[in-house]
């Protein structure tokens, strides 16, 4: 196809979602790369990695991951779960994060490497430029923390040109979204350990 035709067809993909990945091979999808790059909505490398990981995934699924950046599987919002006093979870923070910083997401499983943070937890580089510092938190005495819990969904990091696969066997917690923006996070959880990973 010519560039004008490709741009027109790609526009249809973006505007109406009428194209599906099952109608496009990786080679055909690559024809849209220039258009994708101009709009900042995709790349050949991340599209190929997405299709390798999701053979039945569509171009619409790909665009939804790029644009919505949802931590949850498509169409889901996490399952309401209660963390009780003494429950623990792990969190990656920026290397230069102040000691009192408590992020918004934690994970049940222990974090053992930066590769784990990037790939299993699907943490994009513009979310955390560094992630060597891991903190373990515990829910405060007398507290029940109502969170959303669920598997870690993939992310597409266009800035780094990477498909970050996530891990649907793991449990992540959206810790404070249900509580509003005015709360003090330290009223709910406290740090019990901090360690460095490579």
What are the language-model segments listed below?
Residues 1-22:
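Hydrophobic, membrane-inserting alpha-helical segments
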Residues 16-198:
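Catalytic toxin/effector domains delivered as secreted proteins or via bacterial secretion systems
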């Amino acid at each position: 196809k010519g560039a004008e035709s490709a741009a027109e067809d790609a526009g249809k993909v973006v505007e109406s979602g009428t194209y599906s990945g099952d109608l496009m091979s990786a080679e055909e999808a690559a024809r849209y790369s220039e258009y994708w790059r101009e709009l900042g909505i995709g790349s050949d490398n991340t599209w190929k990695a997405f299709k390798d990981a999701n053979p039945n995934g569509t171009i619409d699924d790909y665009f939804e991951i790029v644009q919505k950046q949802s931590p949850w599987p498509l169409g889901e919002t996490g399952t309401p779960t209660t963390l009780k006093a003494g429950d623990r979870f792990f969190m990656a923070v920026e290397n230069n994060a102040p000691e009192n910083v408590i992020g918004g997401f934690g994970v049940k499983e222990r974090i053992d490497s930066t590769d784990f943070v990037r790939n299993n937890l699907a943490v994009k580089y513009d979310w955390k430029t560094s992630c060597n510092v891991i903190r373990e938190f515990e829910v405060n005495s007398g507290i029940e923390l109502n969170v959303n819990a669920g598997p870690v969904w993939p992310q597409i990091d266009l800035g780094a040109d990477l498909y970050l696969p996530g891990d649907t066997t793991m449990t992540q917690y959206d810790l404070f979204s249900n509580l509003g923006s005015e709360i003090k996070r330290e009223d709910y959880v406290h740090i019990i350990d901090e360690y460095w990973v490579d």
